[in-house]
């Protein structure tokens, strides 16, 4: 979704990853939107997917099947990142493996790392998130990371924990807020 949205906004986008035998819909949608798919590989297994259920408190409950999303290798990461460098943006989501390796290599190359910690899990604790330039997260992920429910407390705690980062906190039907550690823009 993020790759397609950025491509439709006119940004040159290269999507990297591994799809399974069920990946034609994704590949077709990416190509139709103008996303460069040269870094997408196919494996003879099912792709990863996520199911979102809503619980009795109207909160999302995410069920994740890793599939091909968990098949990144160091060699594949090296191959993809070899073509990118300083100032290039790298958008990551927590659905894939090798995040710690990807973040470390991208940071060494002075890329701007954008992290969407969805779906949130303990795997993120293995990553040096101080290397992240921008976090894209919702209120639930913000609470999981900081322990706070209030949007201002979430943003303040994130800025304290990651003082060099910027943040976009999505608020469902209430929109979103951007925070650079100094000013909050709704």
List each model region and its residues.
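Conserved phosphate-binding/catalytic loop of the ribokinase/pfkB sugar-kinase fold
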Residues: 15, 40-42, 52-89
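Substrate-binding N-lobe of the ribokinase-like
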Residues: 1-49
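Conserved phosphate/ATP/ADP-binding segment of small-molecule kinases
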Residues: 108-112, 118-185
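Short beta-strand scaffold segments in enzyme catalytic cores
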Residues: 49-53, 61, 175-179
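Short gly/ser/thr-rich secondary-structure transition/capping motifs
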Residues: 34, 70-75, 114-120, 148
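Glycosyltransferases and closely related glycan-assembly transferases
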Residues: 85, 100-113
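Short, well-ordered alpha-helical microsegments
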Residues: 23, 98-100, 121-125
